């Protein structure tokens, strides 16, 4: 609300207009005083309206500015914390990415090493298979030779017995 003392003090501080001076002079004449008063009163109303608007906006600013400043500082702090958190998360992501890359490289080297071991074992298994195949063949030949030797020995024994028996 506007206080009349404030309006009067502001109006008293306004520079004297020639229109106001003429109203003061015309007030001595009679009728022109009434026209001058209506003219001045409309100007006074405009000045009062603009003054009221200024005082209203100043009052609103006075009321709203401290909370807005407080909110502004809190917002700055929040943005600062968000930036710090974002930077920390970015660093952690980079560390994880680096560790993932390192782990992937380790895994790939393990895969290569195990593949080499597997091919080596496969070659050894093929070599063992070939040797067992040859050994089986030799064993079959040896068994066949022993069988023939045994048959010859039996035949010789039978032949000797037949020679001894015929005497």
UniProtKB/Swiss-Prot annotation:
GO cellular component, one term: type I terminal bouton
UniProt KW Cytoplasm keyword: yes
Record note on disruption phenotype: Viable and fertile. In the neuromuscular junctions, results in abnormal tubular endosomal compartments and a reduction in early endosomes which leads to a decrease recycling and recovery of the synaptic vesicle pool and results in failure to sustain neurotransmitter release during high-frequency stimulation. Does not affect synaptic morphology or basal function.
Keyword Cytoplasm: yes
One matching Pfam family: Snapin_Pallidin
UniProt biased composition (Polar residues): 1-11
GO process annotations (BP): eye pigment granule organization; intracellular transport; regulation of synaptic vesicle cycle; synaptic vesicle recycling via endosome
InterPro entries documented for this protein: BLOC-1_pallidin, Snapin/Pallidin/Snn1
Keywords: Coiled coil, Cytoplasm, Cytoskeleton, Synapse
Subcellular location: Synapse; Cytoplasm, Cytoskeleton; Cytoplasm, Myofibril, Sarcomere, Z line
Span list, region Disordered: 1-38
Main subcellular location: other
Protein family (similarity comment): Belongs to the BLOC1S6 family.
UniProt subunit comment: Component of the biogenesis of lysosome-related organelles complex-1 (BLOC-1) composed of Blos1, Blos2, Blos3, Blos4, Dysb, Muted, Pldn and Snapin. Interacts with Blos1, Blos4 and Dysb.
Annotated function: Component of the biogenesis of lysosome-related organelles complex-1 (BLOC-1) involved in pigment granule biogenesis and membrane trafficking in synapses. In response to high synaptic activity at neuromuscular junctions, plays a key role in promoting efficient synaptic vesicle recycling and re-formation through early endosomes.
Name of the molecule in the record: Biogenesis of lysosome-related organelles complex 1 subunit 6
Source organism of the structure: Drosophila melanogaster (Fruit fly)
Biological classification of the source: Eukaryota, Metazoa, Ecdysozoa, Arthropoda, Hexapoda
